[in-house]
Amino acid sequence: MDLGKVITAMVTPIHPEKDKVCKKRIHHLVNHLIANGSDGLVVAGTTGESPTLSHDEKIKLFRQVIETNAGRAKLIAGTGSNNTAETIAFTKEVAELGGIDAVLVVAPYYNKPNQDGLYAHFVAVAEASDLPVVIYNIPGRSVVNIEPETIIRLAKLPNIVGVKESSGNLDNISKIIAETPEDFLVYSGDDSLTLPILAVGGDGVISVASHVVGKEMQEMIQAFARGEVQKAASIHRSLLPIMNGLFAVPNPAPTKYLLNQQGISVGPVRLPLVDLNAEQGTKLQAILEGLSK
């Protein structure tokens, strides 16, 4: 399955006065991302502030992204939760919308399941889903790490097509790549590890930085694919400051700040997250401006 190389984990545009998901801003953002290097979009993921979106808001968001996208980019819907039955029901509902290519299912958080529980959770979701499933391993948020052996077992299921790996452990990621089928997709969940993961056989990145440096991310990946390793490495090094800067305070506040500054209105973050203060914004803007020097 081809979901692309640069997949943007899209922020959710919120109307600043009404505190509602905003159709006009979604339309503008989706077009911006597709025009600037995104092969695909993850909708209602971590960067999309999924914990503070209601069920109805997520459905509205999916519908509006599907409408604007019109089949141009691959669409991956975030449907995971720490409730297996709820994840299954929501995934089925999303499949009925049409226009979604896959679902991203996060490791159950807070409950702290063991590896057997994690395996059973993903098997249950995959067997009930009409859409391909991408596993999302993010132990920094979910507390539990999906061990390589568990992902390797899950990769044998026909409906589990890939993993977004945000563990930051290259040894584990290398093991997953080595011991899963050739067509099992392994995406970096960390912008700064995109090139290292490509180097050990990964497929691309589910990116935050691509909101503002999407063309550069795409250029880096394409250079590596052509065998221009030094060029790819040079681009990687040049992008590291902004990749790190976008996580200097909790995501997605920095990304929303830069988009708003660039005239791509996406509104504020929702509590309990807070927007950047003036000093933080000035520092981040300086990092971005430094890329062109």
Curated annotation (Swiss-Prot):
GO terms for cellular component: cytosol. Pyruvate binds at residues 47, 206. CDD domains: DHDPS. It is found in: Cytoplasm. It catalyses: L-aspartate 4-semialdehyde + pyruvate = (2S,4S)-4-hydroxy-2,3,4,5-tetrahydrodipicolinate + H2O + H(+). PROSITE patterns: DHDPS_1, DHDPS_2. Keywords: Amino-acid biosynthesis, Cytoplasm, Diaminopimelate biosynthesis, Lyase, Lysine biosynthesis, Schiff base. The record marks 46, 110 as: Part of a proton relay during catalysis. The active site is at residues 136, 164. One of its GO terms (biological process) is lysine biosynthetic process via diaminopimelate. InterPro entries: Aldolase_TIM, DapA, DapA-like, Schiff_base-form_aldolases_AS, Schiff_base-form_aldolases_CS. Its EC number is 4.3.3.7. Pathway: Amino-acid biosynthesis; L-lysine biosynthesis via DAP pathway; (S)-tetrahydrodipicolinate from L-aspartate: step 3/4. One of its GO terms (molecular function) is 4-hydroxy-tetrahydrodipicolinate synthase activity. PANTHER family: 4-HYDROXY-2-OXOGLUTARATE ALDOLASE, MITOCHONDRIAL, DIHYDRODIPICOLINATE SYNTHASE. Catalyzes the condensation of (S)-aspartate-beta-semialdehyde [(S)-ASA] and pyruvate to 4-hydroxy-tetrahydrodipicolinate (HTPA). Belongs to the DapA family. Homotetramer; dimer of dimers. This is 4-hydroxy-tetrahydrodipicolinate synthase.
